[in-house]
């Protein structure tokens, strides 16, 4: 049976999840700015709970962004360190997709407009549709001002709004059937998406793991 570890530090939440012997174990905490100190102990505790060592892992899934730049870098650094040492592949997963998958799990919704507050008066935005239990991207993930967010051109039916970007709901033209602006990515849902990717043969070598920031400029431009 496949044994997968999933971890995410891209937002205020820090979470890990483990699939072993067909069972899922998770640990989730909202601990802003403590991810670097907490992540490895959380992984160690989860493995101990399952009674296995790191060598039992087949692959490691992680939140590749978009999200907080420091948080995304923490995940990449830890994943590459573990994967190099173990000679195991990795599974990069979009944090917007993880939000959509969580909305499916908790709310039973099949169409989700996922949005993460990107600061600088922008949101990370992606629209997802359920297919055989997996939330799949429709269109592209983007970073944009809330008022520019839109559903896919072929959109119909009801859409659910998930993520902190919906704190800008009054500026978003899309009117969802329901929303949860407090929802953060959870490694349990990252694990689900990572397992789908694993079974499709989409694992990559750790060296190829790259963050997806969506935004190139992270600092306020200097005056000329």
PLM-predicted stretches and their roles:
Residues 1, 200-204, 215, 220-224:
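SAM-dependent methyltransferases
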Residues 1-64:
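N-terminal beta-alpha supersecondary unit
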Residues 46-50, 85, 103, 187-198:
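Stable alpha-helical structural segments in soluble proteins, enriched in small hydrophobic residues
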Residues 48-55, 83-93, 107:
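Phosphate-handling active-site elements
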Residues 61-90, 95:
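DPxDG-like acidic metal-binding loop motif
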Residues 180-212:
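Glycine-rich phosphate-binding/hydrolytic loop that grips phosphoryl groups
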